[in-house]
Amino acid sequence: GGFDNPDPVCRTRDFRPKTFIPRQNPFYVALPYNDVSRGEHKAEASRVIPWFRREYAGKGQSVCKGRWVQIVYNKRSCFAQWEDCGPFTTEDWPYVFGDKPPVNTQNKGAGIDISPAVRDYLGITGGTAIVHWRFVEFYRIPRGPWSKYGDNNPFVNAGLGAGKKSLQSREDRLRRQQEAIQRELLKDPAKLRRELQG
């Protein structure tokens, strides 16, 4: 890792920092919501996050971090992972998952922060720009410079492949249910005999 220097002269032609090979995907964004607070999911998380139930992997484990977003600027499209929260708030679920404008009023009402790689790929110059963004499923994302780097990137780390987390969580749930049934049966030997006899 290292400092993701935003100065364009400090970036390579494939949109990464010149001084190091990034261990995290340099194509990332921040959105003004965090689904986890104090080690637990926020009360509204399961209700407002469309993929919550499918991606749930355990108490306090974010279902938002690493989610893919498509960003469009001047008819150019880029893909990035949601890796941070902001700008300026982490509570704005009506904007992130709904149709409300950002509650933030600073920086011309910014509703998304983009990484230097996203900025440069889209050709954004200056401090602010109006972009359009939306969530996208991993299987819909074409290969591009966003698919080259990062231990957190399923293009690079196949162990993070789409659906793997939800499959693992389903398998874990089934295993826990089976273990609970086994514990109950072991508490009552007569019931266990009945179950074994069919």
Residue ranges and their predicted role:
Residues 1-196:
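Secreted/periplasmic proteins
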